[in-house]
Amino acid sequence: MRIMVHDYGGYSFPIQLSRALSERGHDVRHVYSKSVLAPQGSLQRKQGDPESLTFKGISLSYIIDKQSYMKRRRQEIEYGRLLAEEVKAWKPDVVLSGNTPLDTQKLLMKQCHALETNFVFWIQDLYGVAVNRILRKKLPIIGSIIGSYYVNLERSLLRNSKDIILITEDFKHQMKEWKVREDNLHVIENWAPLEDLPIRTKQNDWAKKHKLDQSKCIVYSGTLGMKHNPSLLLDLSVRFKEQKDVKVVVVSEGAGADWLKKKKLEMGLDNLLILGFQPFDQVANVLGTADLLVAVLEPDAGSFSVPSKVLTYHCSGKPMLLSVPGTNLAAKIVKRQGSGKVVEPFETEEFVNQAEHLIRDDIALKKMGRNARAYAEEAFDIKRITDKFESVFG
């Protein structure tokens, strides 16, 4: 079977899926954007890969501007046209597309239908729901018009997909509300590539390079966008400002990271270190540097997003502290597995208090870390995961 896996963000776990599918004899082309600001995986062939696995990055003239709605939309449409051309040229039997803006997804689906290629919509976030909620807050009048357009577009695309993969059972309620056919729905939870994320100690070259190997480190790694709350990371830095042995490390880029850089200078927060996205081969070292890993998600975002960084965190064997709605799948996993603590997003003081308590409790941290890795080793079996995707493709 010729399978095109389109992962707009270029993340690590879909790459692992593409590799696993190719090892089963499928011709696989892994397509991604080279113009999006995101923590991408290793988007290239490795020694021993089957010849049937290829990678294709699609570039625009400029990095996609997430802060300007009109410019961003134009860029996403341009990307969609280039992606459609790639599908037309390669002629896959099936296209699996995730992490994809709806304007792009629309053009991709249109091309798939023209070629009678099966289109599988891989829902990582309820994009239309997210846009609707965010824009209604920012632009009360026009935002509601734009938001309604994207909700309707997402619903239409889902209804016209051959199959739909949901990353959580929690999304089924929205599918029912949109009258999406239930027999088209398949739930496959996200994962992280365990083989690429070995356990590392703080005594690693990356930590030493950044002079973190002798400090207690609270680390945030990943996207810091509109559905996140960077002020919580600032609050952590303020709380630990006088505790010289504690560093708050943020590995991210974009608007959230830029805001933190500005606040760091204004407030003289020498304990706050803000770094850009690191090469994928350094991610294990970044996470290994942490004594405590943190993830944040705004209250509204809990219903349309699941922070995949939490799954990556589990591979590291390090404990975590989440400011995430308790109903979110990531929160449920952490609470069920005992791999960290979860605080509701509006409980800012409790979040900071928990961090201050945990960073000094080595026994609790070690136990949570062991639980985290144990969950990853049990849940992230790529053979079992690939079986599920193959059953969807038919």
Task: Give each language-model segment a name.
Residues 1-49, 240:
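N-terminal subdomain of nucleotide-sugar transferases
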Residues 12, 228, 277-286, 293-314, ...:
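Nucleotide-sugar-dependent
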Residues 63-67, 117-151, 195:
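Acceptor-binding helix/loop patch of EC 2.4 sugar-transfer enzymes
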Residues 106, 110-114, 127, 144-166:
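Membrane-proximal helix-turn-helix segments that form the acceptor-binding/catalytic region
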Residues 170, 191:
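Carbohydrate-associated surface elements
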Residues 209-228, 234-237, 249:
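Conserved donor-binding/catalytic core segment of Leloir-type glycosyltransferases
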Residues 249-252, 257-284:
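Nucleotide-activated donor-binding/catalytic signature segment of Leloir-type glycosyltransferases, i.e.
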Residues 350, 357, 364-378:
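A short, well-ordered alpha-helix in the C-terminal region of glycosyltransferases
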